[in-house]
């Protein structure tokens, strides 16, 4: 079994963590995030170090302690540094444009797609074929990136579509006569 919960979470300067019962709030330069700690997990805050432990020795409690530690660590990283995901558009006429909290996509359909970004996620388009999504919330960022990719996932024959910048698209050979 993994022992993720055994390593404590360090709070960098400028990050404040507050606990109210099972509710934990993390504030930092990039925003504020909140989470509810599972009942089987005990959280201790000592100066700039946060430790997690299972309330009992059950396997599920130890696993949940590791999960909660990872989630709080992602929150601390998010409010201090932030997260970003890069998407690349491949295809003739495929374009993206960020306008405020809306992402305008032209992906070869008969109509353009206007995707409203949720609160806490910002989009930049350094070029017409690149989308840079930024957020303090790692889970929300991944969800938004997945939804944008789902409009036109990369196809295996020509590689056209929306893909993550670090994604490898496995190519297929065209059918021979």
Curated annotation (Swiss-Prot):
Family annotation (Pfam families): Ribosomal_L6 (PF00347)
GO molecular function, one term: rRNA binding
Record InterPro entries: Ribosomal_uL6-like (IPR000702), Ribosomal_uL6-like_a/b-dom_sf (IPR036789), Ribosomal_uL6_a/b-dom (IPR020040), Ribosomal_uL6_bac-type (IPR019906), Ribosomal_uL6_CS (IPR002358)
Keyword annotations: Ribonucleoprotein, Ribosomal protein, RNA-binding, rRNA-binding
GO cellular component entries: cytosolic large ribosomal subunit
Top-rank taxon, per record: Bacteria
Alphabetical GO biological process terms: cytoplasmic translation
Function statement: This protein binds to the 23S rRNA, and is important in its secondary structure. It is located near the subunit interface in the base of the L7/L12 stalk, and near the tRNA binding site of the peptidyltransferase center.
Description of how the protein assembles with itself and partners: Part of the 50S ribosomal subunit.
Family classification: Belongs to the universal ribosomal protein uL6 family.
Name of the protein in its database record: Large ribosomal subunit protein uL6
Gene: rplF
């Amino acid at each position: 079994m993994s022992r993720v919960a055994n390593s404590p979470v360090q709070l960098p300067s400028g990050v404040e963590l507050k606990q109210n019962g099972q509710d934990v709030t993390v504030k930092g330069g990039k925003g504020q995030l909140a989470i509810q700690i599972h009942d089987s997990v005990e959280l201790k805050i000592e100066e700039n170090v946060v430790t997690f432990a299972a309330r009992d020795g059950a396997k599920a409690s130890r696993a949940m302690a590791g999960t909660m530690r990872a989630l709080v660590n992602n929150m601390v990283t998010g409010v201090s540094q932030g997260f970003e995901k890069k998407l690349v558009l491949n295809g003739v006429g495929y374009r993206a444009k960020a306008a405020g909290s809306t992402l305008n996509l032209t992906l070869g359909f008969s109509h353009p797609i206007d995707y409203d970004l949720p609160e806490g996620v910002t989009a930049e388009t350094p070029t017409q074929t690149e989308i840079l999504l930024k957020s303090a919330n790692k889970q929300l960022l991944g969800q938004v990136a997945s939804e944008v990719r789902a409009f036109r996932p990369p196809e295996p024959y020509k590689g056209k579509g929306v893909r993550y910048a670090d994604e490898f698209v496995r190519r297929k050979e065209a059918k021979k006569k």
